[in-house]
Amino acid sequence: MDYLPLFADLKQRPVLIVGGGEVAARKIELLHRAGAQVWVVAQTLSSELEQQYQDGRIHWLAQDFLPEQLDNVFLVIAATNDTVLNAAVFAAADQRCILANVVDDQPLCSFIFPSIVDRSPLVVAISSSGQAPVLARILREKLEALLPTRLSDMAAIAGRWRGRVKQHMASMGERRRFWEHAFSGRFASLISRGQLTEAENELQLSLEGQHRALGEVALVGAGPGDAGLLTLRGLQVMQQADVVLYDHLVSPEVLDLVRRDAERICVGKRAGAHSVTQEATNQLLVTLAQQGKRVVRLKGGDPFIFGRGGEELQVVAQAGIPFQVVPGVTAAAGATAYAGIPLTHRDHAQSVTFITGHCRPDGDDLDWQALARGRQTLAIYMGTVKAAAISQQLIAHGRSSTTPVAVIGRGTRVDQQVLIGTLAQLESLAQQAPTPALLVIGEVVNLHHQIAWFGQQPQTESAISPSVVNLA
């Protein structure tokens, strides 16, 4: 170990910064977060530091550095481009046994700054001892993605409750088990949902031995296919699941991110072949949660856009089961972005309408007259089976048969296919497309030939002649 990792209490302690430029400003911002009393030695200040001085956030000594300025200083940072001055600052500090840091000059440092993940009061510091700072930064970025921002609330509440827990539990082992259960159970779930008062109530119930073995349901949008489009929150919830109920639309790449020990149950439905009824899925969510399990209902795209997520949560709520919702990137947004088709464009479409091709059994009540108007984009989910009827209705209500259309099959995945043609050709294109597929109708489809970026470049056929672009 080249450096001993320490966490220093700088609240109201004097820290000297030699230098008044941008580098100094970055270090000063970190010192402010730690509550330090900052003194700056520099002939001039950057505009940012000048404003901080005017606001009374820093003290300014508008003079050259003198060793006497180190008297009663807790630590010092040299942030100038003058190597001679930096060396003098370090030597003077070292002589006085004051910790010193010369920015970007490790030999002249008695302490160094780590990469930091700040979830105060929880702070994670990462250091490569100055040998590989880029690697330390990459690790910090990974931890930023993995550690929920609400950890700060969790740690703060735990700090407030330490005394009460100690009064109730004399054994250190008993206290450890209490907190292990809290940090991985309902207390943590309530924190993640921002329900801080309820979280503290849960701690009180646990202390009183009234903890209920009640699970919860998390409705999570898995996105359109590319696992990279899964949200950080979605990943975090999936990593905590005891059981995952998923649809056929969820890609294998996303399923691979589920916690390894979690039970996986496919409740997917396909057109004309409903393997699990919706009622059975609803009841399964309730039953599993009542067993005390953390249940993730994983749905392709966004669960509240043609995903029946609202129906499922109504049943969960009626059963008194706690739940949360994690939005996902809906297929219309993800697939069109990967196909180079903007849903709106100032010159072509001032609105976009999302439509489902699966109609309720009591009939189709779509306003075809409104949908056939120009200067708008139609994004149709699950519409391949009814592509012929959709095309006929739009043309019958005034939409030009030469209106550009795209059928995007397996959008955002490595085997994505984009088929381009006209409204009159929609049925034929839909029959060729791999599923799941999204239908896009409108002038914005023409932009695909200019700004498609994912995989191979688009073919150069006319925007209104049939073309197939395999973006694998």
Curated annotation (Swiss-Prot):
Q: Report keywords, A-Z.
A: Cobalamin biosynthesis, Lyase, Methyltransferase, Multifunctional enzyme, NAD, Oxidoreductase, Phosphoprotein, Porphyrin biosynthesis, S-adenosyl-L-methionine, Transferase
Which Gene Ontology BP annotations are present? cobalamin biosynthetic process; methylation; siroheme biosynthetic process
In residue numbers, the region (Precorrin-2 dehydrogenase /sirohydrochlorin ferrochelatase) covers 1-203
Q: Phosphoserine (modified residue): where?
A: 128
Which GO molecular function entries does the Swiss-Prot or TrEMBL record give?
NAD binding; precorrin-2 dehydrogenase activity; sirohydrochlorin ferrochelatase activity; uroporphyrin-III C-methyltransferase activity
PROSITE patterns reported for this sequence: SUMT_1, SUMT_2
Q: Which residues bind S-adenosyl-L-methionine?
A: 224, 300-302, 305, 330-331, 382, 411
- Give me the reactions it catalyses: uroporphyrinogen III + 2 S-adenosyl-L-methionine = precorrin-2 + 2 S-adenosyl-L-homocysteine + H(+); precorrin-2 + NAD(+) = sirohydrochlorin + NADH + 2 H(+); siroheme + 2 H(+) = sirohydrochlorin + Fe(2+)
Enzyme Commission number(s) from the entry = 2.1.1.107, 1.3.1.76, 4.99.1.4
TM annotation in the entry: none
Domain of life the protein comes from: Bacteria
* Alphabetical list of InterPro entries matching this protein: 4pyrrol_Mease, 4pyrrol_Methylase_sf, 4pyrrole_Mease_sub1, 4pyrrole_Mease_sub2, CobA/CysG_C, NAD(P)-bd_dom_sf, Siro_Cobalamin_biosynth, Sirohaem_synt_dimer_dom_sf
Q: Which residues bind NAD(+)?
A: 22-23, 43-44
Q: Does the keyword Ribosomal protein apply?
A: no
Pathway(s) annotated for this protein in UniProt: Cofactor biosynthesis; adenosylcobalamin biosynthesis; precorrin-2 from uroporphyrinogen III: step 1/1; Cofactor biosynthesis; adenosylcobalamin biosynthesis; sirohydrochlorin from precorrin-2: step 1/1; Porphyrin-containing compound metabolism; siroheme biosynthesis; precorrin-2 from uroporphyrinogen III: step 1/1; Porphyrin-containing compound metabolism; siroheme biosynthesis; siroheme from sirohydrochlorin: step 1/1
- Family to which this protein belongs: In the N-terminal section; belongs to the precorrin-2 dehydrogenase / sirohydrochlorin ferrochelatase family.
What PANTHER family does UniProt report for this protein, alphabetically? SIROHEME SYNTHASE, SIROHEME SYNTHASE-RELATED
Function recorded in the entry: Then it catalyzes the NAD-dependent ring dehydrogenation of precorrin-2 to yield sirohydrochlorin. Finally, it catalyzes the ferrochelation of sirohydrochlorin to yield siroheme.
Provide the protein name. Siroheme synthase 1
Organism annotation? Yersinia pseudotuberculosis serotype I (strain IP32953)
Query: Coding gene?
Result: cysG1
